[in-house]
Amino acid sequence: MKHIVESVEEMYHARQPTGEVIFDEVLDILRHYKLIYPEDVALLMDVKVRDLRAAWFMLTGTRLVDVITHWRVLQAQDWLRKRLGEISTERCEKGELVKLLKETARRCGWRSEVVMSHVFKRYCGTSALEWLKTL
């Protein structure tokens, strides 16, 4: 029987365990580590990545790599919202926003803000800078 998850956003904001051991452990790892790849999660769980991917797909019907990537986008959005609130409006020039994007990318585990923006575009329909300007 598949454990159906409505959305990654629902998983991201959920705080109660589901009772599915693999599912709950993966979510706990995502909440506490800056991981990008299923191999990293599998290493922490001490399981083969192939087995983890298969188990995750059986439980959720989604690919683990897609969930991890979307999770990181949600974390970046949360961090950007928080930091933007701390920056005064007169400092919100393009240069300051680029610095904020670099800081966010590093904090959320991406190699660069360019990579983060590319992923943002895929998941949000806009680059991270354009998304940030809408706030």
Question: Residues of each region from the PLM?
Answer:
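Alpha-helical bundle regulatory/interaction domains
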Residues: M1-L135
